[in-house]
Amino acid sequence: MVDSVGFAEAWRAQFPDSEPPRMELRSVGDIEQELERCKASIRRLEQEVNQERFRMIYLQTLLAKEKKSYDRQRWGFRRAAQPPDGAAEPRASAPRPPPAPADGADPAPVEESEARPDGEGSPSKGRSASARRPAAAASADRDDRGPPTSVAALRSNFEKIRKGPAQPGSADAEKPFYVNVEFHHERGLVKVNDKEVSDRISSLGSQAMQMERKKSQQSAGQGLGEAPRPHYRGRSSESSCGLDGDYEDAELNPRFLKDNLINANGGNRPPWPPLEYQPYQSIYVGGMMVEGEGKSPLLRSQSTSEQEKRLTWPRRSYSPRSFEDSGGGYTPDCSSNENLTSSEEDFSSGQSSRVSPSPTTYRMFRDKSRSPSQNSQQSFDSSSPPTPQCQKRHRQCQVVVSEATIVGVRKTGQIWPSDGDSTFQGEADSSFGTPPGYGCAADQAEEQRRHQDGLPYIDDSPSSSPHLSSKGRGSLASGALDPTKVSELDLEKGLEMRKWVLSGILASEETYLSHLEALLLPMKPLKAAATTSQPVLTSQQIETIFFKVPELYEIHKEFYDGLFPRVQQWSHQQRVGDLFQKLASQLGVYRAFVDNYGVAMETAEKCCQANAQFAEISENLRARSNKDVKDSTTKNSLETLLYKPVDRVTRSTLVLHDLLKHTPSSHPDHSLLQDALRISQNFLSSINEEITPRRQSMTVKKGEHRQLLKDSFMVELVEGARKLRHIFLFTDLLLCTKLKKQSGGKTQQYDCKWYIPLTDLSFQMVDELEALPNIPLVPDEELDALKIKISQIKSDIQREKRANKGSKVMERLRKKLSEQESLLLLMSPSMAFRVHSRNGKSYTFLISSDYERAEWRESIREQQKKCFKSFSLTSVELQMLTNSCVKLQTVHHIPLTINKEDDESPGLYGFLHVIVHSATGFKQSSNLYCTLEVDSFGYFVNKAKTRVYRDTTEPNWNEEFEIELEGSQTLRILCYEKCYNKMKMTKEDGESADKLMGKGQVQLDPQTLQDRDWQRTVIDMNGIEVKLSVKFTSREFSLKRMPSRKQTGVFGVKIAVVTKRERSKVPYIVRQCVEEIERRGMEEVGIYRVSGVATDIQALKAAFDVNNKDVSVMMSEMDVNAIAGTLKLYFRELPEPLFTDEFYPNFAEGIALSDPVAKESCMLNLLLSLPEANLLTFLFLLDHLKRVAEKETVNKMSLHNLATVFGPTLLRPSEKESKLPANPSQPITMTDSWSLEVMSQVQVLLYFLQLEAIPAPDSKRQSILFSTEV
């Protein structure tokens, strides 16, 4: 007998109220039989549940019909006007549900005969608005004219059968009742209330269905299965009934309402121009129509003034994916019904709960909607009738309509506040004569909309930008629209600025149109290929990927064509507001595009993976970059171009803010632009209400959300190897992921490496560190070699840009640069950040900045206060969470300079002088010091440290530091308390034992710092304030060696002059500084690298210049770093470098030789050729630096570190003007060549430091022998 281990225990744990079933499982055959019985039972129970649900929904709808007030607000309707007493008769018969389907068979599709997309019958076949429904006799006459040729005609005949002999004008005319009808995909209507229809009706239906199939075969888009996709909509070629050919029933054709009810001013509207393509169709649902005497059902109680009232309609769900069997139909949406049980909610999750755009007219006509966040039953998101939908089952439903409506509003968020008056708010837009826009909304069920999660967050604030873009946009003042501010400006200047703003908008529109053209370019050949035997993509895929792109192009082309001549013929009274207002009114097309964006990206990715030809096409889309140059194009990917409309719609408010800022309130355009701005802002707000919670969270349990708090790239130490990771901090866990390698056309994907619930996470303390491995440090020589390569590649890229050579060379260089920068980012960090899990596992990250490490610690600890329970994720949950990271991430690129946009600031190159004055705000006396960090090559580096100010709450350091900047944009300052008591140490992560008291940062703005004056600033650190002064000197000015004006001094005087005056071989200042450093500075950490106090250095400089006899006493009392700084300053201020201007180019060429023998001969020959004073001083310093490097284990100064510090100081030539670029607007070229030169200087000095023996100066004559070897 097979042992069913653990089944009974698991059953009781899951179902404590019932005993586990007994199963006799003696063999594999018994198990299979039991499994089949279980499956059969499930099928039977599912059928019974579905039947009962159908009955429940039917009873709900019937109850809603009988009780007109039942759940009215959830349906989204206003109160229906009640018919006069006696005007209605009881219905002849109650509706019945269709017979239950047989086991295993699909149920017959059930719809009302009217429930067809209006695009599937000819709209022109219905009567025009002027023709009201005649008496029944007239309808009978119409039957004799021949077979009907459209669904509308078929519907009219069915209405006649349904109504019987009732006269339309009589007060007791029978109301339309609800019937059960059955459709056949070939014969049309076949049953009414379970009774077979007559042969005549059946033949009419067969003819109508044949006509629909013929039309659907000619249409561009094809639906799923046998269902025709919505096709071209406009005037039918068979039409003989006027221009518009509207249906006679208002419910069946929204345009009937638009043209006949909404024309508030009584004028005739121009005919709609035909749309090229309309993917969504209005579908008649059926409804409770109240007929009056001689009036159309919807107009019975409406007076002339009532026609102007804004009208409402229930939200409808149109899912292109649900039209599988019956060729389309209304699919009720129950995903947001709050009164369903949990099982009902499961049942209501069908295909149509996905994105279902519905038709809409002008967004101007929309009524006030409600935000889904309000969870109100009056929300339009909850307004669907409580009817289930199923993949292959279409149910009838009832709609109680109180007033005529324009269209179903499928949207959340407020378009504009309703003021409650009865005036029609769409008049300003009624003269445009453009077809209706389209709006679409998203259902709230997250699991049904995973394909929509790819949408970036859209911020409607004027100073913000979407997710993917890191470009800074100038923020606009909040009072930009204040007329008092505008009035203060010079009117003439403001109007002139208005023209320039419009010119900028024109240029932007031109670029945007070129991007849309680039998208449309491959669409036509792809569509043509779709009909061949070897299609690249199917028609459905093409429609999904390029959805709404043609409409967007037409909208913006019309806008551009209207704006261009007005700007060309400019005057201060020129009006453009109507164009912007019209553009804003068509934002509904963007709504449809944005809602489809996630599906389009997902489809494109799948197509790229499945078809190499399409992958190639999607990576090489050409957009015109210059209108004046024919062949000037730029290459873009499909992903980039598809994001352009999303990015574009977020900027709609920005241009309007700019335009309004320079438009006087008295100008005719002002009110129109304000209206356009209001529409745009409300549109973006409505999108935000839906996207924000979806983007920032991932559903954990019902009512709970896991939100992303912080993420960044880090280096993880895994068994001694460095690995690049992307770390995500959620509200309840820390997730470590690895970015997968990307191939052409693919989007980012992550692999989960590990996760720790925040309740299980801790930071390691000092007593736990003994068993932890040491951090493998990368030698500085390797890091500098990487920097040399990076600088060389950047220089090559700049040269290629100037030469305008082929893009292949540029792409190859960019790839090499990315690889080298990634390697540098991986090798540079050395500061440990360790996290420990309760299960005993530890993980180590390497960070280059203590500031960043402190930020992560603070964020994790703050969130841990809100977490109380541990948990574990299933593999499916973990995979879903990892997949969501692609959409949720805020850091999209590895922090490399290659990822910077061309218009981003390259940062500052030069020297930053910083004075750390004082700090206030400490609550108790402490031993305090500060450190300074700046960013370089994409990561932050610690550059300087103040002395410790003991036992004080208000330290006054007043220390000055000179920090070299290499593309730096940010200065960070961190304030610590020095811990001398070992019992007090926390020593987290095995690093500094000192306590971080506060941290802050200041942006290094090139505009502010260019004047080379001191800038005072105060940095706030949560109550602690640190006062700083900063001054920047660019490399252009720091390159020059300035000779001293007085020849009696030491600084700035030629070394030969000083040694001759002192009658010594080595200058006194060099000997004194070296002796003092060797006496007490050999074990000083960072000697020569840590900056000394600037005031002490200046004091020593002055003492040496005046030949003060007490200088040795002064030095003994000063910090050793100040003495080291004085020695460096002396060599830096020599009017000619120690290696002389004459020999510097030869040294640079000699170090580049590849043959080691030739290199040694050349370098020694050049060295021994230096003037005697220069040579002896250099050899004296060289011996000292070698002795410093011998203490490397203590002072952390290797030969390479020393070469980095002294290389530029000893070799940098005095005259550099000829090598500087003439155009200062090319900072990258200058800084790259500078970096290469600095690296070369470092290499020259490092070569001599690494030589074991150098010939004595008195062997100078041997240079002849060396030269012969070369």
UniProtKB/Swiss-Prot annotation:
The modification N-acetylmethionine is found at residue 1. Keywords: Acetylation, ATP-binding, Cell projection, Coiled coil, GTPase activation, Guanine-nucleotide releasing factor, Kinase, Methylation, Nucleotide-binding, Phosphoprotein, Proto-oncogene, Serine/threonine-protein kinase, Synapse, Transferase. One of its GO terms (cellular component) is Schaffer collateral - CA1 synapse. The keyword ATP-binding applies. Residues 67-173, 201-249, 295-396, 412-481 are annotated as: Disordered. Pfam families: Bcr-Abl_Oligo, C2, PH_19, RhoGAP, RhoGEF. The lineage of its organism: Eukaryota, Metazoa, Chordata, Craniata, Vertebrata. Residues 121-139, 348-358, 371-384 have a biased composition (Low complexity). Its main location: other. Residues 198-387 are annotated as: Binding to ABL SH2-domain. It comes from Mus musculus (Mouse). This is Breakpoint cluster region protein. The modification Phosphotyrosine is found at residues 178, 247, 553, 643.
